[in-house]
Amino acid sequence: MKALLDYSKIEKYIIYNDMTKGSFCKNAGISYSTLKNVENEKGIAVASAQKIAAALHTNLLSIIKEKKHE
């Protein structure tokens, strides 16, 4: 199963917290290529989506826009 995320919310978080994309990836425990897949609106693994949501806020699972089965 794959998830699509709203990259604009992630980008706002990165900018607001004066982070780099690399430091965000390190804090979230994801690879930079995973973040690029989010930015390019490619599906990512749900586990990675959950890591990103947890890095933003523990209750912010609403950034998952859509789930698609593959």
Where are these regions (language model features)?
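Residues in the helix-turn-helix
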Residues: 23, 34, 62
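Recognition helix of helix-turn-helix/homeodomain-like DNA-binding domains
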Residues: 29-44
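The alpha-helix within a helix-turn-helix
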Residues: 14, 25, 53
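Short, basic-rich loop-to-helix N-cap that marks the start of a DNA-contacting helix
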Residues: 41-54
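A short, Lys/Arg-rich alpha-helix, primarily the initiator
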Residues: 1-22
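Short C-terminal boundary/hinge segments that cap the last helix of small helical domains
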Residues: 57-70
